[in-house]
Each structure stands twice: as structure tokens, then as C-alpha cells.
């Protein structure tokens, strides 16, 4: 990746991260980067969103059960 493309990617990720914070998604930069990469290779964004929600629900259930 050339320097200009790398800078554009960093700026795009920063913008997505800011939007994520405004929407209070709780997703960090790394997670957002992985989700963007998965979308770039053709995975359905709605399916990914559903998966993230399910994983959070499962995590909350596990945390509640352990406490």
C-alpha cells in the first residue's frame, strides 16, 4: 500500500471511529478495522451487525451468569 492510500485508510478509520463514538457503539478501532475489512471482502454488513449484537448479548448473559 502506498503512503497516500495508507493515510486515506487511517483517516477513514478515524472518521468511522468518531461516528462509532457518537453512536455509542462501544467498538474500538481494532474491531472497527476488522469489520471494515470483512465488508471489503464482501461480507454482508447487516449480517455482521447482527453477529456483533448476538456476541454482545451472549457476553452479557455469560457475565451475568458468572456474577
Swiss-Prot record:
One of its GO terms (biological process) is centromere complex assembly. Part of the gamma-tubulin complex. Interacts with GIP1 and GCP3. The keyword Heme does not apply. The gene is GIP2. It comes from the Eukaryota. It comes from Arabidopsis thaliana (Mouse-ear cress). Required for gamma-tubulin complex recruitment to the microtubule organizing centers (MTOCs). During mitosis, modulates gamma-tubulin complex localization, spindle stability and chromosomal segregation. Necessary for gametophyte development and embryogenesis. Keywords: Cytoplasm, Cytoskeleton, Microtubule, Nucleus. Disruption phenotype: In the gip1 gip2 double mutants, embryonic lethality and impaired development of male gametophytes, severe growth defects and sterility, characterized by microtubule (MT) misorganization and abnormal spindle polarity, resulting in ploidy defects. Pfam families: MOZART1. Its main location: cytoplasm. It is found in: Cytoplasm, Cytoskeleton, Microtubule organizing center; Cytoplasm, Cytoskeleton, Spindle; Nucleus; Cytoplasm, Cytoskeleton, Phragmoplast. Belongs to the MOZART1 family. One of its GO terms (molecular function) is histone binding. This is Mitotic-spindle organizing protein 1A. The keyword Hydrolase does not apply. Mostly expressed in siliques and flowers, and, to a lower extent, in leaves, roots and seedlings, with highest levels in young tissues, meristematic cells, and the vasculature. InterPro entries: MZT1 (IPR022214). GO terms for cellular component: gamma-tubulin ring complex; microtubule; nuclear envelope; phragmoplast; spindle.
